[in-house]
């Protein structure tokens, strides 16, 4: 809590700076730029190999502020989010720095083995209900409190009924008798807005920041840690009800390549490319990630482990698994 560390793998960069902003808002001015140092220790072990890894430790807490990386390459410069960012400013535009305390929720605990009593010994016994946070809670007929509609906390609210007095949302799921819910994508995604400024409908298959929960499902968009606490609270409620939580993940493509932190940190590495420099398109959405490349495989594993160890996620559904 008394220092802030940054690491970035960008082996083709010539210089890298951490750009820290005064707050976590999208329009916050720059507070300071810090020069990062390039690692030069070679090892066959990923943990010990620092070649191409840029490091910086600032001897103070920068929690609550947004940041980006300014990266110089031989022929261009990029300003980008952290590929490993766990929290963002609204709409996922900038990475956000959080302290461990800002991620904690009273009563939330990651459990494994026999302590995870809601998990099944035999996966063939799973009865899975696929759900979308917004679909479950956004309608006025959901009975969910207006301030919680479309949010993680809304999906865990109890005592909700429709106009006929029938159970809705969380209570409805509990009455179904299922033992797992499969959440359609809850990681940060690209968003568009209508003329009234409302987020347009989206199932979530436009990934933008893989390790950060979707900010529009937070009860406080101005606090980058709130969405993490809200999601943990929701997951704990389902676990307490004896229901496991499966997460739908979309590692096969990103919404954008130009603005994606993959392309802006290691150009032309994380995506499958054609000989003419264009993107391969096996996904049908304009690009596909290169899971045959070692560092993207590592990224996927790191990301999955983060969701398990931080949020106690019980399983994953892989979108377009054939791409991998």
Give residue ranges: language-model regions.
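The feature marks proteins involved in alpha-glucan
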Residues: 1, 31, 35, 46-157
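Short proline/glycine-enriched turn/loop motifs at strand-loop junctions of beta-rich domains
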Residues: 9-16, 62, 132
């Amino acid at each position: 809590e008394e220092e802030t560390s940054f690491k970035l793998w960008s082996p083709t960069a010539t210089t890298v700076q951490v750009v820290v902003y005064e707050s976590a808002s999208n329009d916050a001015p720059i507070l300071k730029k810090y020069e990062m140092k390039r690692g030069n220790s070679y090892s066959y072990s990923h943990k010990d190999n620092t070649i191409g890894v840029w490091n910086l430790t600032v001897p103070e807490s920068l929690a609550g502020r947004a940041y980006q990386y300014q990266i110089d390459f031989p022929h261009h410069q990029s300003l980008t989010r952290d590929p490993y960012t766990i929290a963002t400013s609204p709409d996922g535009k900038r990475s956000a720095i959080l302290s461990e305390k800002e991620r904690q929720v009273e009563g939330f605990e990651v459990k494994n083995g026999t302590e995870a009593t809601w998990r099944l010994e035999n996966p063939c016994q799973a009865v899975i209900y696929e759900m979308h946070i917004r679909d479950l809670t956004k309608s006025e007929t959901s009975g969910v409190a207006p301030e919680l509609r479309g949010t993680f906390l809304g999906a865990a609210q109890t005592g909700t009924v429709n106009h006929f007095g029938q159970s809705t949302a969380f209570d409805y799921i509990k009455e179904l008798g299922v033992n797992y819910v499969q959440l359609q994508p809850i990681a940060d995604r690209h968003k568009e807005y209508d003329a009234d400024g409302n987020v347009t409908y989206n199932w979530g298959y436009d990934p933008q920041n893989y390790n950060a929960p979707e900010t529009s499902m937070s009860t406080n968009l101005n606090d980058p840690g709130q969405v993490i606490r809200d999601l943990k609270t929701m997951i704990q409620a389902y676990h307490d009800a004896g229901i496991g939580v499966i997460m739908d993940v979309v590692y096969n493509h990103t919404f954008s390549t130009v603005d994606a932190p993959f392309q802006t940190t290691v150009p032309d590495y994380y995506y499958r490319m054609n000989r003419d420099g264009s993107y391969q398109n096996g996904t049908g959405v304009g690009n596909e990630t290169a899971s045959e490349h070692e560092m993207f495989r590592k990224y996927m594993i790191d990301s999955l482990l983060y969701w398990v160890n931080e949020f106690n996620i019980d399983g994953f559904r892989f979108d377009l698994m054939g791409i991998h």
